[in-house]
């Protein structure tokens, strides 16, 4: 690891808006993620969902939606191997490298400074380059010397995105990436994901964000998953139509029984 003797000034970002970009260093295979008949939960006595099956294809952006507490974050942690697989199969495709954004921000070390949080991951990168990248994410001047424990939720979110952008993975798994971000940063993140040459699987409650970036929507329920080939508006339109069909069928069956 290089000696860090000289303290350099981080270049100022005059615009006041973070510059976020992602680029995959290597291409993955066409099939990025395959999930087949997975049981979802913390243990077999407390299952959240069963028969979870879906595929994620290269360069698609898939939004995972569902009711609160249904297990969206649990599914992500199971895919990442942070929770045990209770049943079924999860398979990453050829040459897939995963970058993870944790909504709980637990992947950050609270004892490290902003600068060291990034530099420790890339020790051979010159300090001026690290500071320049941090500056583009609005960490300028003395802000890079702050401890992670002293950062706001928004600052931690930007630090996580800084680290993610430097990894150059080809499959980003993002758990509520817009939480804590201001409107300008959200819009920049939308652009960055739309220009990204890799694949994205993300959870969000922000329908505007989903509409701006998702190519497909995956709905998680206790009975499994349903894939919708479109944005959030398309998903709402299709689910509304399905509910109307269900109500019409139920009404018809009730009337038939009454006769």
Language-model-derived ranges and their functions:
Residues 3-14, 247-248:
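Proline-centered turn/helix-capping motifs that create local helix->coil transitions or kinks
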Residues 20-259:
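ABC ATP-binding cassette signature C-motif
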């Amino acid at each position: 690891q290089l000696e860090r003797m000289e303290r350099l000034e981080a270049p100022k970002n005059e615009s006041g808006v973070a510059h976020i970009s992602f680029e995959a260093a290597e291409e993955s295979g066409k099939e990025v993620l395959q999930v087949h008949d997975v049981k979802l939960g913390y243990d077999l006595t407390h299952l959240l969902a069963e028969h979870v099956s879906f595929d994620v294809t290269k360069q698609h952006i898939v939004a995972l939606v569902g009711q609160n507490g249904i297990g969206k974050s649990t599914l992500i942690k199971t895919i990442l191997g942070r929770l045990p697989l209770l049943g079924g199969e999860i398979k990453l495709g050829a040459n897939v490298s995963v970058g993870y954004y944790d909504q709980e921000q637990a992947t950050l070390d609270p004892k490290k400074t902003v600068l060291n949080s990034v530099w420790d991951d890339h020790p051979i990168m010159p300090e001026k380059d690290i500071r320049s990248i941090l500056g583009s994410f609005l960490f300028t001047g003395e802000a890079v010397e702050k401890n992670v424990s002293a950062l706001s939720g928004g600052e931690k979110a930007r630090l996580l995105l800084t680290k993610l952008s430097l990894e150059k993975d080809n499959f980003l798994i993002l758990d509520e990436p817009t939480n804590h971000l201001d409107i300008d940063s959200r819009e920049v993140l939308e652009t960055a994901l739309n220009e990204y040459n890799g694949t994205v699987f993300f959870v969000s409650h922000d329908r505007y964000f989903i509409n701006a970036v998702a190519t497909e929507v995956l709905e998680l329920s206790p009975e499994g998953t349903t894939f919708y080939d479109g944005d959030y508006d398309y998903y709402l339109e299709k689910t509304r139509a399905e509910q109307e069909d269900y109500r019409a069928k139920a009404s018809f069956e009730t009337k038939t029984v009454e006769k």
